[in-house]
Amino acid sequence: MPLRLLLLLLWLWGLQWAETDSEGQTTTGELYQRWEHYGQECQKMLETTEPPSGLACNGSFDMYACWNYTAANTTARVSCPWYLPWFRQVSAGFVFRQCGSDGQWGSWRDHTQCENPEKNGAFQDQTLILERLQIMYTVGYSLSLTTLLLALLILSLFRRLHCTRNYIHMNLFTSFMLRAAAILTRDQLLPPLGPYTGDQAPTPWNQALAACRTAQIMTQYCVGANYTWLLVEGVYLHHLLVIVGRSEKGHFRCYLLLGWGAPALFVIPWVIVRYLRENTQCWERNEVKAIWWIIRTPILITILINFLIFIRILGILVSKLRTRQMRCPDYRLRLARSTLTLVPLLGVHEVVFAPVTEEQVEGSLRFAKLAFEIFLSSFQGFLVSVLYCFINKEVQSEIRQGWRHRRLRLSLQEQRPRPHQELAPRAVPLSSACREAAVGNALPSGMLHVPGDEVLESYC
């Protein structure tokens, strides 16, 4: 659920504190139903109303009040919305909005006559918490976007790092970048929710509805692609460790098809059903839960599969580290480090709250779930880029070698040697930088290489 929508729900929830009728306090569900019913009545009214013949502003429900068609260069006035719990206290009040001379709604809106006479401190505090969470995930996605772009450039520029494993990493980095960019773009296009006063009223977004829905579709695809590439990482690592004796180089096209093609299999049906059955606003509200499960179900399946792969890999890690316990007495520390390293790569943290829906949690648990998911999702790309690029030993070795080669070339240019005496830096074999897993490799000691050890070293 987008954070701006949650801000609206929190606002509606906060309204119930303001008034208690003879039958008791209004529940959150009843309040939301009244607000939803108000919006539906507005849509029906607009459908049955003939637009004026001259230049006029379009009728719309701006998530607060219902506005009829209004002649250009006039100020529209409507009664305070009846869904407000304190409506009896402000029933004589009005909301005002300016229709410009060009037939477009202006940014000015005044509903001071409809404001709650009694401000609620608890609601304001929780609204502040959600606004800070939005700032946090904006910082997280921005940081992830920057570090992922740098990591992608590093893996692309150093040719000796080109192998199937790093190709998959690069596609995963790209999916994280697209997810971050799509979410940040969607936030800018989503309709501002909640009440505003005077000059704080936001610019109407009806004209950008198509762009907003397009951004919503792209966001769902990018999020789905991110989960499928996390699944590709898990499947690839599992194949390297379990299905020994078979090369993975020829499977990369299948991984590409799975990573970028699978999300379209559930996003396209969701778009069609959403357009036919729930074509409202910017598609940010999921009122018909069956439609939302078209997207949610495949994502939950990928999370579950990756969690099972994670458990399987942990079993392999434990068995291999125990066999080398005499040589590696700190195997428990290495196991803990490997476990923590694989968590962001496979998205294992998602399994904590994945089975819990928005309707199943309330109060503090809902905020805890939201904060947990927002923090880890926004900073996950940053963690993956750091763990699998910036502090990766192979990447660091290539950067050092590239720096030494550059210094050597500069030194040779300064010495100005004769053409037949010019020296070239010695190339490093491909296998020394990016090694694919091989079965039966001989170690310097003459012992046979244990299948999977090199893979675990590369990942963990």
From Swiss-Prot:
Annotated signal sequence is 1-18
Localization annotation: Cell membrane
Q: Which cysteines are joined by disulfide bonds?
A: 42-66, 57-99, 80-114
User: What's the chief localization of this chain?
Assistant: membrane
**Keywords from the named record:** Cell membrane, Disulfide bond, G-protein coupled receptor, Glycoprotein, Membrane, Receptor, Signal, Transducer, Transmembrane, Transmembrane helix
Q: Name one GO biological process term.
A: response to calcium ion
Q: Name a GO molecular-function annotation.
A: glucagon family peptide binding
User: What positions does the record give for glycosylation?
Assistant: 58, 68, 73
- Which sequence ranges are listed under topological domain Cytoplasmic? 156-166, 244-255, 319-337, 392-460
Q: Which residues lie on this side of the membrane: Extracellular?
A: 19-134, 186-222, 277-297, 359-370
InterPro entries per the record? GPCR_2, GPCR_2-like_7TM, GPCR_2_extracell_dom_sf, GPCR_2_extracellular_dom, GPCR_2_GIP_rcpt, GPCR_2_secretin-like, GPCR_2_secretin-like_CS
Would you name any one GO CC term? Answer: plasma membrane
Q: How does it sit in the membrane?
A: Multi-pass membrane protein
Membrane-crossing ranges are: 135-155, 167-185, 223-243, 256-276, 298-318, 338-358, 371-391
Record PTM text: N-glycosylation is required for cell surface expression and lengthens receptor half-life by preventing degradation in the ER.
Assembly behavior: May form homodimers and heterodimers with GLP1R.
The record's similarity note reads: Belongs to the G-protein coupled receptor 2 family.
Task performed by this protein = This is a receptor for GIP. The activity of this receptor is mediated by G proteins which activate adenylyl cyclase.
The identity of this protein, by name, is: Gastric inhibitory polypeptide receptor
- From what organism does this protein derive? Mus musculus
Organism lineage string: Eukaryota, Metazoa, Chordata, Craniata, Vertebrata
